[in-house]
């Protein structure tokens, strides 16, 4: 069954968020994330942590279709590869880009033939092809970003992130910062790794409404019906600009795109709204990475970013291959283990009220200790 690891979990009316992780150790959603690379390879780093055996390790990464410089999960994954090479001088890394989904299998086979020590595939859509290759080549180590398997595969380090949690914090913050009483979110494609962010964001707004007796509305997503706004890809910035302009015209003053590079179109729309005389002030949140690093030209509009700890998770998968600690299995990044987090407020640090910051800390603690249960129809484990 296609994507069976997810489909099985998705049969439940509401899958309760999993707060535990297994497999190898990964942490820190606040790790710096790069904006991609100009070349398809990176030489071994000059870091201080040399591999004990001195054995050379080749780490190979395959992007999803958004490109290496998507300012999102591809760029973060490549930054993790480069961080591994910097940490261990015996590691070298390179990548292949997937222009379409038809490139997945040829790219995987190319790297298998090149005898890569670990092949890192990026994105939910690569789940089936990675599984097929891993089962056909049990001695080949893999890691995959944004997917997990049930049962876990011993030669695949499956890296998934419970972004319903920090999405919830983002929604709570957005509701608390909105002046119009309307906020909005949209996705690139309707995939579980996209809608889980949107579920969390939606629920965070509802929780704020409950606590403050407010009625802040969410445009672009309805968790109950699982219907909402999607641009259809992760690359078309014009679509992102258009859908954001529509939300702004409907009164939304905080926008949360879950759409990779499409989010740059949203940022352009926010920038244009800011320049329009007499218009309502509009701001936004970035996704996956700290937008003030990966899309710094729009930092003044980013209240925060709803992050995944992809950089550290990928780095650990590659360095674990080099030092012999690779375990395989499923890893779930959470608030508790540092795998997901809100980014710093940057330019908004003085604009977010102290009381709201305190509430966010309380909500974070509630999610971590289980007193706040987040339900999402997007599964977070295999």
Regions found by a protein language model. Give the residues of each.
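A residue-level marker of the well-folded mature domains of exported/periplasmic proteins
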Residues: 31-382
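Hydrophobic helical h-region of N-terminal Sec-dependent signal peptides
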Residues: 11-16
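Short, low-complexity intrinsically disordered segments enriched in small and basic residues
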Residues: 1, 29-30
């Amino acid at each position: 069954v296609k994507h069976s690891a997810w489909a099985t979990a998705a049969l439940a009316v509401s899958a309760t968020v999993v707060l535990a992780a297994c497999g190898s150790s990964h942490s820190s959603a606040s790790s710096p994330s790069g904006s991609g690379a100009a070349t398809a390879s990176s030489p071994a780093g000059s870091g201080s942590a040399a591999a004990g055996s001195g054995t050379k390790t080749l780490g190979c990464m395959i992007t999803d279709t958004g490109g290496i410089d998507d300012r999102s999960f591809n760029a973060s994954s490549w930054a993790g590869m480069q961080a591994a090479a910097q940490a261990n001088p015996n590691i070298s890394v390179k990548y292949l880009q997937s222009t379409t989904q038809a490139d997945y299998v040829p790219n995987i086979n190319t790297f298998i033939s090149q005898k890569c020590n670990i092949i890192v595939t990026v994105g939910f859509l690569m789940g089936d092809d990675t599984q097929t290759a891993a089962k056909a080549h049990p001695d080949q180590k893999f890691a995959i970003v944004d997917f997990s398997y049930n049962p876990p595969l011993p030669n695949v380090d499956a890296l998934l992130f419970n972004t319903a949690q920090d999405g919830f914090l983002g929604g709570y913050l957005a509701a608390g910062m909105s002046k119009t009483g309307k906020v909005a979110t949209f996705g690139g494609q309707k995939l579980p790794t996209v809608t889980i962010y949107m579920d969390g964001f939606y629920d965070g707004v509802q929780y704020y409404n409950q606590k403050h007796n407010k009625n802040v509305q969410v445009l672009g997503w309805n968790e109950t019906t699982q219907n909402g706004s999607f641009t259809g890809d992760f690359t078309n910035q014009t679509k992102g600009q258009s859908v954001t302009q529509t939300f702004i015209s409907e009164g939304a003053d905080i926008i949360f795109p879950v759409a990779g590079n499409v989010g740059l179109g949203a940022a352009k729309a926010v920038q244009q709204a800011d320049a329009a005389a007499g218009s309502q002030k509009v701001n936004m949140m970035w996704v996956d990475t700290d937008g003030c690093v990966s899309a710094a030209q729009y930092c003044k509009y980013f209240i925060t970013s709803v992050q995944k700890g992809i950089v550290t998770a990928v780095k650990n998968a590659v360095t674990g291959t080099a030092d012999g600690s690779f375990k395989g299995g499923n890893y779930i990044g959470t608030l508790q283990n540092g795998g997901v987090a809100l980014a710093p407020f940057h330019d908004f640090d003085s604009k977010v009220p102290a009381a709201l910051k305190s509430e966010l800390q309380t909500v974070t603690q509630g999610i971590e200790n289980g007193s706040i249960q987040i339900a999402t129809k997007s599964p977070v484990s295999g």
